[in-house]
Amino acid sequence: MNKRLIKLIFIVCSTVIVTGVLYKYINQNYPKFFKESQNIVSFYALLLLLFSIIYSTFSRKEIRRFCFQLAMWAVIFLVIITGYAFRFELHYAYHRVISALIPSYKWSTEVGEIIIARSGDGHFYINACVNNVKIKFMVDTGASDIALTKEDAQKLGFDLNKLKYTRTYLTANGENKAAPIILNSVVIGTEFKNIKGHVGLGNLDISLLGMSLLERFKGFRIDKDLLILNY
């Protein structure tokens, strides 16, 4: 950037600052000044005179170059401001795109909210930390409590031979005997303690996340292909 262009920028910036100060001074000390059309015309005529001096001082090429650079910076500034103003919407849009690419994708928001995308088979899946062990669940609002597969129960340290299968649960495949258990800690976004669950004699393909945990959230809802949990 040559010296003449730097000088041009300095003069334009100075003109803008002086104009702003002058406008504020007049508006504060003479509140009725800008209510009269004649005074407004005079004020803008002064601005026109200032810019005319600038145009007469510099060549058209330098003016065009300055205006182009000024426009570029204005666009950059506008993009930054727009991105900041719509940062939450952009954050949501980003995760929606990822959820379309990755089935059962889960993300958290800043307001204590977990959002889970529906998988291709129509179900919602979520990973939870149960007693410090990672377990994958399928969300089942029809299940009264958490149902663990035999494999997951063993991961958590339960001895299947010592469990008491004293309860009867109704499943899609009929009645099933199960042993009631208590899960000391389940972490999904936040920690929930003493959650009711059971281990059945039947063969589950995947552990089920039932109402004994879902009802501990502040709220949950299904919005189209999203499961939204609030904690």
From Swiss-Prot:
Pfam family, one: gag-asp_proteas
Subcellular localization: Cell membrane
Transmembrane segments annotated in the record for this chain: 6-26, 39-59, 66-86
Main localization category: membrane
GO biological process: proteolysis
GO molecular function, one term: aspartic-type endopeptidase activity
Cited InterPro entries: Aspartic_peptidase_AS (IPR001969), Clan_AA_Asp_peptidase_C (IPR011969), Peptidase_aspartic_dom_sf (IPR021109), Retropepsin-like_bacterial (IPR034122)
One GO cellular component term noted in the UniProt record for this chain: plasma membrane
Membrane topology: Multi-pass membrane protein
Domain of life: Bacteria
Keyword Acyltransferase among UniProt keywords: no
Record keywords, A-Z: Cell membrane, Membrane, Transmembrane, Transmembrane helix
Organism lineage: Bacteria, Pseudomonadati, Pseudomonadota, Alphaproteobacteria, Rickettsiales
Name used for this protein in its record: Uncharacterized protein RP867
